[in-house]
Structure formats: structure tokens, C-alpha cells
Amino acid sequence: MEDIKTTWQKIIADTLNGIAPETCDKILPEQINIETPPNPEMGDVAFPLFTFAKSFKSSPAKIASDVCARLLENEDIKKYGMPKAIGPYLNVFLAKGDLASNVLDKVLKEKENYGKTSSLSGKRIMIEFSSPNTNKPLHLGHLRNDALGESISRILKFCGADVFKVNIINDRGVHICKSMIAYQKFGEGKTPESENIKSDRFVGDMYVAFHKYSQENPEKAEAEAKQMLLDWEAGENKELIGLWKKMNGWAIEGIKETYKRTGISFDKLYFESETYLKGKDQILKGLEAGVFYKEEDGSVWVDLAPIKLDKKVLLRSDGTSLYMTQDIGTAISRHKDWPFNQMIYVVGNEQEYHFKVLFYVLKQLGFEWADDLYHLSYGMVNLPEGKMKSREGTVVDADDLINSLQDEALKKIEENGREKEVGDAAVAAENIAVGALHYFLLQVSPKKDMLFNPKESLSFTGNTGPYLQYMGARISSILRKAETAEGKEKLKDGKLNASLLTNESEWELLKTLEDFPEQVERSALRKDPSALTAYLYELSKAFSRFYRDCPILSGEDADLSYTRMELARATKIVLQNAMNLVLIPFMEVM
């Protein structure tokens, strides 16, 4: 069944074509933008007509008035709703019965597919996120990165895109060598198993130990780390390479456990140790072609004046590469591995300069697909105590944060005496913790810095993940009651009749359900899940008002009770679909 808003797009496009000047191109339904009026008194849906002013050589208000007048001449239009011109907008008061029937039928039929669109069908989108170092566990900053990358991947896929998720593991460099030196000096042959410590935490403890060592012996410690890196790059010290592989293995094993815990996955892992030499040949080709230039000391540079920046070194005077060089090579390799229409890098805003230069250099090298590269920049995430630091060992580890949230959630379950109802209380508490974490991280627009408040995130009331989970469990409980002998008795003669849904709370809930596909599109277009988190909160509030105002099983009218139960069922479907897109575990019981 066609969406009622899509029907109105077609109606308005046809009407515009009927009154357009002969010089105008044919107007297509998808050219008609859709908005929601600021208050219900102005209608249920608004269609701005600004974009047609130039081709019509008329004001948007005049166009809206003419379209409205033409529509009101057609009595058949009224079955879809009543149009009204309000300034440059054509607003529509939708026919409640038809909308209710349309929405319920569509949601109940499409189920987990409700809200999916084909707007990105045929698009191949690669997205890079997380990018951990193998000298320490994931921290709170990674959690924001991971949540953004995974959520946006799911949203883009929901809109029809073929999405390929990649992760570059930073497994080489001086910082990796520092953990290795500490293990050689202080590890005493210990392992994560022997110390009963999560493997990435064990490696991170070595990094902290090196920092303490370097404070006591600064010049010696740094010299040792640099020498170890040279020895590693030479590749001849088998014992050193063995230690590197062992410690990287520990770190990656632990990091993967955290990914599993938070619902994060990838289609391909890249390793810096395999990519760091890439790109040098491309820089030399660019030098030969005159795209880059060489200084007297032999270093190779690019002039960034065309993008209003200074200049950037691409190869050092000794011929060694930089991060920029390897990122150039890695980007080229990825496009060969999996030709994409767009490549999204989810990386903090401190790297904005880096990506401006990277995209420009690739374009200068003749790669047209450089226009399809996008840096999804996001802000710093802090705790109330202040910024995170890693080398001193005062960083907020991802696992520690989740564990503390889980402990608090478990306390609440026990305080409310819900251990028996939720089944495995520890699993339920972890689901609440992950939901609280992801909702809090994703409700803020990526570009903004944010303060993560663990206590606020766990609240079961207000704009939080646990509140959404509670609402899902509440609806599930209502639906279970319908399956009891008493519920079946009350509903046995009932039939679905959407025209009975005339209460204002029912109407608002239906309109909110109908709005879900539009919110998915908005989040995909902006690459910003915060529109969906805001939508989830509005949906939960709309259901709460409906449940308060409209008795489901206590009514005398069997058809009305049955229809309201189906409205609750539809709400659960949309809630589940939306929560999945923003990584919040749905809970049948809380």
C-alpha cells in the first residue's frame, strides 16, 4: 500500500504540471519536499513550494494558493485529506480513517522491513570506523566512534545501500614498541591468563608501565623505543617479531570481545603493519608528473594553496613515509578491493586538516573517486571528571565503563525485585547498560563535543535508553496479556477497524508511526543518528499518552479493543526497528 504522503506528492506534482508555464520541465513527485507543520492546527503535513518560484515566475505563496484552489475543485481529493494554502506552503489535514488504515496495514504487513527505503539502492558505501591501537583497550572515545560507525552503517543499509564496514588496526609504530619494551623489562613471562586479566587490558598495563619507566629515564626510554621500531622494520629479529605478534594478538583478542559486547562488527580488518609502506610509489609518480615538488633536502611536498592551506610534506628527506603517505596508498588499495560510490571515514574532528589534504592529494593524483570521500567528523567526549588520558593509565576504559553501568543496572533490577521476571539478571543488566551507553552517545549530533554522564544515562525516566527499553517491555507485556485466556475472550469477536481510532492520542501515535521512514531518510542524508534517537523518544511519549487515554482491554467494544491492540503491536514493531538502528537492545521484559 502506498504511503499517504507519497500519494500527496503525486497529487501535488500532477497539479503543478497542470498549471505550470509551457517552458517548465515536467515536475516529478520526488521533487516535492515534505515537512511537518510546527503545530497541529496548521495541518498534518506541509509541502513547501519555494523551489518552483523561479520556473513559474511567481511567488511561492501564489503557487500554493493556485494549487490549493485547483485541488478543492476536485471532490475526489477529499478522501485523501483537506489541503490548505498557508503562505508558501501547501498544508494538508489528512483523512484520519484512511491514514490510520494505511499506517496500520503497512506496519503490520512489512514488520521488520517497515521504514526501509530504496533511496540508496545501487550505492556501494564503504565506511571506516574504530581504528584502535594495539597497545591499550578501547576507551570512551572509541565507544562514540564505534556507535556512530555501526549506527550509520545500519541506517544506510536500511535505505538500500550496499555497505562495507572496514577497520584499520594501528598495530605498528613507536607507541606499540613502548608496550613491548615494558613487557621485556617488567612482564616476567606473565600472560593475561596467568594474571586473570582481559588480554587488551594486560597489554594496556604494559603501556602504562612504560610511561612510568620513561618518567624516570626519559632519554633512555625514548631511544629504546625508537631503536626497537627500527629493528622491527628491519624484520630480522625473530624474537622481536614473535613478541610483537604475541602482544598484538592479545590486544586484538580483547578488543574483539568488547566489539561483541557492544554489537559492533566489520566486514574487513586492515592492519597498519601491512599498509604503512603503501603510497610511496604514488608520491613519486606525482612528483614525476609535476603534481608535487622536491625541496633541496630531498623531501617531497604538495602545495595546498588551491584549498587555501599552506603546504604539506609527503615524503621525508630520507625517503621514509608519513601517515598521509600510507593513507593515500590504503585508500587506493581499498577502492581496488571493493570499488565504492562513497567512502566515509568516521574520525574525530582533530583530524579535519588531515582529511582535507588527503582528499586533495588523491584528486591531484588523478583519482576521480576522491570526490566521493567523506570525513564524518565528530567531537570530543568527556566524563564529568574531565578529559581522558591514556598513557598515564587514567583513561576510562570501555569495559570499565560498561561494567560500572551494568553493576548499577543490576542494582536497580534487584531493588525492584525483578530478578525472576528478567531471567538472567546479569544479561538483562548488560543490555540496559549497552542501551544506556549507545543512546546517550548517539543523541548528540556528531559534530558537537559531549559530556557523558553515566548516572543520567541509566535513568528509567526521561530521554534515555532505559526509558525506551522500558516502553518496549511495557508494550510486550500488554501484547502478552492479549494472549491470556482473559485477553483472548475479550478480543475473540474483534476485527481491525482503523476508522474507530478517533481519539487525539491515537491520532498522534499513528502520525508518529507514519513518520518513521522520513526520519530514517533524514538520518541517512545527514549521516547523523540523533534524528532517530529524538524520534524514538517522541514515539515512546506518544505511546505513553495513548496508553493513558485509551483503555485497550477494558473497553466494551471488541472491535475498538482489537484495533487498539494492533496499534500497540505496530508501535512495538517500529520501536524495535528504530532501536536496532541506534544499537539499543530491545527487551521483552524489564
Curated annotation (Swiss-Prot):
Keywords: Aminoacyl-tRNA synthetase, ATP-binding, Cytoplasm, Ligase, Nucleotide-binding, Protein biosynthesis. GO terms for molecular function: arginine-tRNA ligase activity; ATP binding. A motif ('HIGH' region) lies at residues 132-142. Gene3D superfamilies: Arginyl tRNA synthetase N-terminal domain, HUPs, Isoleucyl-tRNA Synthetase, Domain 1. It is found in: Cytoplasm. One of its GO terms (biological process) is arginyl-tRNA aminoacylation. One of its GO terms (cellular component) is cytoplasm. Belongs to the class-I aminoacyl-tRNA synthetase family. The gene is argS. It catalyses: tRNA(Arg) + L-arginine + ATP = L-arginyl-tRNA(Arg) + AMP + diphosphate. It comes from Treponema denticola (strain ATCC 35405 / DSM 14222 / CIP 103919 / JCM 8153 / KCTC 15104). CDD domains: ArgRS_core. It holds the Pfam family Arg_tRNA_synt_N. It comes from the Bacteria. This is Arginine--tRNA ligase. Monomer.
